């Protein structure tokens, strides 16, 4: 029972909180803050009970999994705080359905991370997917939000069918859906079973779709553009971290006796993601769409770490996705503090000259952009350096050179943001009331970007 405590706790918090919010509608803000406090307590419970060994063959808990869940929950809490402060800033009523959907989505991610069985992993991913579709379309009267959510749902449903079809192949040719059983077969069978490999590839399509890696990335620009900013922070941070951990959990199945087949497939996906992400962003004017392409690019970098297939590569991948999640949250909170209700229309045009009127926010956005480029001594530099160093050390020169090349290309549009703020004509922006939750998040991000490198080094 203690092993399932994080999942049970979050489910109860979500459902009971929703019930109280419906019964006492005029106290939504108080209930919302209580739920955030309970989620913070859940972080410590998740970490505390993560040392117990798994009670089921299909469900694993260990210290590393507990740490992963705690980090994901922390990023989720940040997204919830952003939603609360954004609602206060623009004068909207807090909708408790948002926190319910997000917490249930996290339960799905937790199940997926602990899964050691393809069917259980599929169920966890689908719970996350279904709630994510609703979060993407949470702006009910917005055409772009509805369009993005519908596209996300249709493509996601198609990929889910492929994933389930893949599980049937795995069971049919492997005789089991347990990770350990399939791994034992792959390591001991003298002949490779093509049907088993096809099944694994079909199942992987679902993970790559949720990661928004190319060529399964076409949904993400429209979804980011139409979704509420709070949902976008969740998709960029907690959701992506969870899917990267899931991918690392099944990495032994991806790269085994059939190494050349799946290795080359994932290598192509990584290179395409880096190229599409880098060049696709150049023509963008919307800052939310720009970050969508930036996500595609950075997922390509993460896949480099997965392809290295060693502990150092996995550490580099996890470190990089964590740094990118923090940087993205910093960028989105700055946009909220600048534009408030008009944040969805934020573009290069709307940030022109803001350095004259919003010096602190412009400086923070600049630091975020420099970290994304990988300029030392910011934390983003050490994330990229560690990743590319491990790739070169493993003699993966193609991946390393492609990563360095696309980093140079991406520097063009990251610096374009800085140029618009400091070297363009001023456009008047109304100063909005200060929201201390957003301000605290921004200062924490700033501290991480400036001093996080010392943690990495020492």
From Swiss-Prot:
Care to name a GO molecular-function term for this sequence? NADH dehydrogenase (ubiquinone) activity
Keyword hit for Ribonucleoprotein: no
E.C. code: 7.1.1.-
Record has Glycosyltransferase as a keyword = no
Q: What reactions does this protein catalyze?
A: a quinone + NADH + 5 H(+)(in) = a quinol + NAD(+) + 4 H(+)(out)
Q: How does it sit in the membrane?
A: Multi-pass membrane protein
Q: Write out the entry's keywords from A to Z.
A: Cell inner membrane, Cell membrane, Membrane, NAD, Quinone, Translocase, Transmembrane, Transmembrane helix, Transport, Ubiquinone
A Pfam family name for this chain? Proton_antipo_M
Q: What does the UniProt entry say about where the protein is found? A: Cell inner membrane
Task: Mention one GO biological process in which this protein takes part, according to its record.
Answer: ATP synthesis coupled electron transport
Which of the seven top EC classes does this enzyme belong to?
Answer: translocase
Primary subcellular site in the record, as a coarse category:
membrane
List residues traversing the bilayer. Answer: 2-22, 30-50, 71-91, 93-113, 118-138, 153-173, 196-216, 235-255, 261-281, 290-310, 319-339, 361-381, 397-417, 438-458
Any one GO cellular component localisation term in the record: plasma membrane
- PANTHER family, per the entry: NADH DEHYDROGENASE
Instruction: Give the protein's biological function.
Output: NDH-1 shuttles electrons from NADH, via FMN and iron-sulfur (Fe-S) centers, to quinones in the respiratory chain. The immediate electron acceptor for the enzyme in this species is believed to be ubiquinone. Couples the redox reaction to proton translocation (for every two electrons transferred, four hydrogen ions are translocated across the cytoplasmic membrane), and thus conserves the redox energy in a proton gradient.
What the record says about family reads: Belongs to the complex I subunit 2 family.
What does the record note on quaternary structure? NDH-1 is composed of 14 different subunits. Subunits NuoA, H, J, K, L, M, N constitute the membrane sector of the complex.
HAMAP family to which the protein is assigned, alphabetical: NDH1_NuoN_1
What this protein is called in its record is NADH-quinone oxidoreductase subunit N
Please tell me the species this chain comes from: Rickettsia prowazekii (strain Madrid E)
The gene designation is: nuoN
